[in-house]
């Protein structure tokens, strides 16, 4: 039987630790070109995980997650340039800022209604509104953005590394931390609350779940998860501009990666990111770096996913795993796969609910 | 004088936004599909006009009727796609398809026409002078087109049996079905009509617009603003909302700094959403 620590299965934790260690050493052995691709993939995986966290647990389709990455990046570069605050410290400060900024956005989307489409449109408007605001704020460098002040002999605390390997490793660690957090969340009381809210807002309010508060809390946590990615990415690219994070393609790439990965498993976003960034890079290389090929590949892969597997790679995996387990005569041990749509859930919904209930009370 | 010019430009620009918004309000109200690619079809129409004018050297309006037919066919295909995904996966499936189409169209336009903004400069359609402003003929045609189409849609929705069926579906699909309205057909008609309208609107405004591959996203946001201000499924409200946005936009460009011209409309939408939330679950 699966032993658990704080609700986390030990075998999953061991698998994660092995993956982390393998990734850590593998990154050291790869060529610079591959590392650059992986840095990008592992960076995108974080806002994508933040999106999947919201979408998977609460069913909120937020296009604003890139905003919180930008908040992280601007926080880091501004604090470092003006006050000399170490980026390592910014890793802790940025989530707080992102959470504060997420609060009114969460309020607006909760107030406007619960429909996924409406939330998607509102958050799209917010992400389109942020760049002009950022550009209008003079200390943040306007349209040019901010450049990290580089040092000739940077110390460890300046987080300026010559090679991409260190950044890739940092992104890897951040990803693993987020996966662990999401695994814990799914098994915790909060996880059950938000899934109940997603499946039936009225019923969960009736049994005493503070629905509005849980919605806002989840939104704020998702924002805090996305912010550290901005800090590290700003240090990696040594600059931060509104376009870098919120430009037409950058904004949607996060969503595409998240949906390709799927929200059914915590690792979905990492796998989705590595697959899609690798494919887009390969296609771009095949076209001799012709402009627009990368985004077009993203779009093409997304079309395939949207039509063929709307729950993403990890959603399909979860579906197959459950089918296999049922064929073997076992019970559904995995946490209920967040279905894309409550009405479209499998028929054996009662089995899911029963498991949830047992774990919640036990 | 300056104010009058700004108002005139605003009304002309707003007329087109109304048209895009009328389509969007139909697709959400009747089709119950939030087609994220709605604005992208405007972009397709614009680039089609650019291609006709720039590559073929023709007046884009010459190919108005064939383009309308093509957009209607494409629209029907997309409507089937939405219907299929909606049946299989629900509203999220439709959302994904819309988003995927938006990105695909943005990507294709960017690869096909380059990422930089382009304008169609070699099409001359004369001009008229109103209130001291020289207004290009194409803008007059666009405004007349909007007026005719807007009035046509109004008469269709109010006067015809089909229009009544569409309004019934917008009001309450279940009851409409009980009364014998073929709801799936009505929804397909709404989606098809909105896409055809969006594409043709794009073709009509192509001679006097700046074209960028991701212009579709901007039109999506404007269309959303139109339904937020005008009400879901309310075509008359959509027309007024479009005009309002056009005028506000034009005044903002005339009197305020550039920050406000991009930010202003977005803030208006957010304010409207907070004061008067959208009544329908979408």
Question: What is each model feature region?
Answer:
Chain B
Residues 1-2, 78-88, 276-282:
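Transmembrane alpha-helical segments of polytopic membrane transport and secretion proteins
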Residues 24, 57-101, 108, 240-245:
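Alpha-helical transmembrane segments within multi-pass membrane transporters and channels
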Residues 2-54, 83-89, 229-235:
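Single transmembrane alpha-helix segments in multi-pass membrane proteins
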Residues 1-16, 157, 161, 190-227, ...:
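Inter-helical junctions in multi-pass inner-membrane proteins, predominant
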Residues 13, 19, 131-211, 235-241:
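Helix-loop-helix "hairpin" substructures at the membrane interface of multi-pass membrane proteins
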Residues 112, 171-185, 255-282:
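Cytosolic-side transmembrane-helix boundaries in multi-pass membrane proteins
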Residues 85-159, 186-189, 251, 256-257:
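Transmembrane helix-bundle core of multi-pass membrane transporters
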